[in-house]
Structure formats: C-alpha cells, structure tokens
C-alpha cells in the first residue's frame, strides 16, 4: 500500500463528479488518510467559501480511502450514517481532509473526519461516519 495505490483508487472506484473535485492523497498510515481538496470556483459559494456539500463529499471519499488503508485493499462498503458539524467558513485556501477509522467490526466500520484549512490549520468541519461492510 502506498499513496499511488490510494490515488489510483480515486480514479478507479469513485464517480466522475467525485474525480472532478481533484482530491490528492497527501499522506496515509493504516486506518488514516489525509487528502487535499484544492480550492476552486466550482466548489465555492459567495465569498469564495468552500461549500458544505463539497466538504461532505470529500469527507465520505476520504473515509473510504481510510478503510482501504485499514484493510490493505478495497472492501465493498456503503455509507450508513454521516453526521457533520460545520465550525467555521473555509475561504481562499485548500482544505486538508483527515479521515480516521475508529473501529471496524464484522459488519460495521466507524470513523471520524476533520477538515481544516491548509494554510491556517483551523478546523472548519468535523464529521462522524458509519459504514456497512458488504
């Protein structure tokens, strides 16, 4: 497992609109992945703020990659629940999306995601997730 494997998973496993977000794998370790979501006009709202929809899509995507890094390969899964808290606007900078597997059982996996500004390091969104392992 390496960053290239995880980057390739973005192209192989996700819908074209997710690929259009141009997510980049920055780092990983087993059960943890950090992605960079580049700032773009297509994902921004008034005031160049990153939209909540883009943050949630990036969070969900990062968590699937964290599960891949946990298992060592892709294991089919589906999102059961995602709870998000938007803490502050994220404007005029890339976002770092860090996903961490908290626990994996036989049927369910649990994780948490923190999205922060790449320049200021301030947390803009926190999410918790539950996935069904298929």
Predicted features along the sequence, with ranges:
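Terminal targeting signals and extreme-terminal segments of soluble enzymes
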Residues: 1-134
């Amino acid at each position: 497992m390496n960053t290239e494997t995880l980057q390739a998973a973005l192209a192989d496993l996700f819908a074209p609109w997710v690929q259009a977000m141009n997510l980049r794998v920055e780092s990983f370790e087993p059960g943890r992945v950090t992605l960079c979501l580049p700032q773009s006009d297509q994902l921004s709202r008034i005031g160049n703020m990153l939209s909540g929809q883009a943050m949630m899509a990036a969070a969900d995507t990062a968590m699937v990659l964290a599960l891949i890094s946990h298992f060592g390969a892709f294991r089919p899964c589906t999102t059961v629940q995602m709870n998000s808290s938007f803490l502050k606007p994220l404007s005029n900078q890339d976002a770092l999306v860090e996903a961490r597997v908290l626990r994996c059982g036989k049927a369910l996996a649990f994780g948490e995601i923190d999205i922060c500004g790449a320049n200021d390091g301030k947390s803009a969104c926190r999410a918790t997730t539950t996935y069904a392992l298929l």
